[in-house]
Amino acid sequence: MLEFEQGFNHLATLKVIGVGGGGNNAVNRMIDHGMNNVEFIAINTDGQALNLSKAESKIQIGEKLTRGLGAGANPEIGKKAAEESREQIEDAIQGADMVFVTAGMGGGTGTGAAPVVAKIAKEMGALTVGVVTRPFGFEGRKRQTQAAAGVESMKAAVDTLIVIPNDRLLDIVDKSTPMMEAFKEADNVLRQGVQGISDLIAVSGEVNLDFADVKTIMSNQGSALMGIGVSSGENRAVEAAKKAISSPLLETSIVGAQGVLMNITGGESLSLFEAQEAADIVQDAADEDVNMIFGTVINPELQDEIVVTVIATGFEDKPSSQGRKATSTGFGSSVNSSSNHQSGASAKEDSFSAHTSHSQSSESVNERSHTTKDDDIPSFIRNREERRSRRTRR
């Protein structure tokens, strides 16, 4: 179902809270990039690390418990530190309509304190979104186990959760990419999501979206996908939509999403046909009965560029794809093409795949051969054609 939302746009208050070393670093990089209409808060048990934060609000938690020396990679200490400093956290969150809590899972402060911070934010009535990373495989089993427990705690505390496995950074960078540049790629998922929502609710459009629309799609929805796609030139709408729904860093693909908030921003040349093209790409990739709320904004400064922002939620719980190399919605052009990628999106591709045994009939083999030629066609386009074919046969 495609809904058009029109009316007055109320400006909501957005706050981004970085918890622990990883969360603090993410906040610093977002501040360096430059963002408007967002308040940044840094929370840590390590007083020395907190001094390096560029956030306007800094909270040292668990001063009595840790004496400012950190959580020692113990999530239980991180949790108790946040509980000790609950009042300070509440004061910092006060007045927020939406709170992003970002942290690295696997250590002490981020893993233990971030779920407590998120729970406080949600209890105070803020729409609460978690953006967390899983540790690299080489960091060891103990850290992976702690991270898994932290992710589950975050799921229980937030409205929606976005998980970025650090191992996937290895798929989108080459061997010569500096480490800090690689981490910026992960931070971009958070930055683009926050920037996209900020723009959605702060800029009035021809077909308008407001904070109520964001809440409709993101409240109590579990896993989420947030993405922004930018393109220009021929097929710009289609290309921007593809980029928005295909981040190789995320554990969740858009396949099966039951709720989608989509905004298209373009110059005065943005046409109705282009808006329809972009919406079709997103709608066909999501669930057949998706609740899709759609908005457009005309920004003359963009000239030939189109920006597509997508927030997708309402996924059925699926086994974690932590061990898989990258998500796939049929695109992922930034991913190393030599890798063998598979994700939740590929579940819909299985009926088209060429994995057949030698005992199959010649008809099956012919079908496999035909499918192989179409391997470069995005799965959701093939799904769309299949649905249309079924409707025609009826």
Curated annotation (Swiss-Prot):
Residues 328-346, 353-364 have a biased composition (Low complexity). Keywords: Cell cycle, Cell division, Cytoplasm, GTP-binding, Nucleotide-binding, Septation. One of its GO terms (cellular component) is cell division site. Essential cell division protein that forms a contractile ring structure (Z ring) at the future cell division site. The regulation of the ring assembly controls the timing and the location of cell division. One of the functions of the FtsZ ring is to recruit other cell division proteins to the septum to produce a new cell wall between the dividing cells. Binds GTP and shows GTPase activity. Gene3D superfamilies: Tubulin/FtsZ, C-terminal domain, Tubulin/FtsZ, GTPase domain. The lineage of its organism: Bacteria, Bacillati, Bacillota, Bacilli, Bacillales. Residues 317-394 are annotated as: Disordered. Homodimer. Polymerizes to form a dynamic ring structure in a strictly GTP-dependent manner. Interacts directly with several other division proteins. This is Cell division protein FtsZ. The gene is ftsZ. Belongs to the FtsZ family. HAMAP family: FtsZ. It is found in: Cytoplasm.
